[in-house]
Amino acid sequence: SVKIKDVNGDGKINADDRTPISRDPDFTLSLNTTLKWKGFDFYMDWYGVSGRKIRNGYLSESNSGGSLQGKLNGVKVNYWTPFNPSNEFPRPSHNTNVTYHGSLAIQDASYIRLRTLQLGYTFPTTWIKKLQLQKLRVYATATNLLTFTDFLSYSPELTPGAYPESKQYVFGINVSF
């Protein structure tokens, strides 16, 4: 069964034990850099948030009609079994209807994501003059490569009904005549 924490320590579970949360993060983080060396260029963009608490729809009433039932849309949950005596989530069953499922679903949605990574090479002018070109650059770009988070879902940025961010790989050529 689920046990609710006596937050204020008065020995009673009541409205005084409620803890306010906010969807707004404590910090928003961003780091991007461009490095160039002998025709090579490298670009990297990291983004993240820290201290954001949200209701995880995969663990709350929007999933399986309000009960865990062991079906969590492919998200692995650390629930109690005789072989795994965890106290993170109650053991799911078809008869389980967790009364406090809403509080179980509040999770830290902090994350750090590598949004963009690009590597390119611009050919020297002496090489491309023979081809009657002013500029020739080849590059590869990848987006949404990595996300570091403890949030139990496909993405800490999206609701369960949305498609997760796709990874994209682009190869290109820039030519100036």
Residue ranges and their predicted role:
Residues Y43, I54-N56, K129-L131, D150-L152, ...:
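Short acidic, gly/pro-rich beta-turn/loop elements at beta-sheet edges
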Residues L72, T81, T99, L145-F177:
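C-terminal beta-signal and terminal closure region of outer-membrane beta-barrel proteins
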Residues W37-G39, G48-R52, T116, F123, ...:
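Transmembrane beta-strands of outer-membrane beta-barrel pores
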Residues S22-P25, G51-K53, P156-L158:
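A short local loop/turn or secondary-structure capping micro-motif enriched for an aromatic residue
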Residues W37-F40, T126, L133-K135, L145, ...:
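Strand-connecting loop/turn motifs
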Residues S1-Y43, F89-A109, L114-T116, G120-I128:
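Outer-membrane beta-barrel transmembrane strand signature
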Residues V49-R137:
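Extracytoplasmic gating/loop element in the C-terminal half of outer-membrane beta-barrel translocons
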Residues M44, V138-A140, I173:
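Membrane-embedded beta-strand positions of outer-membrane beta-barrel proteins
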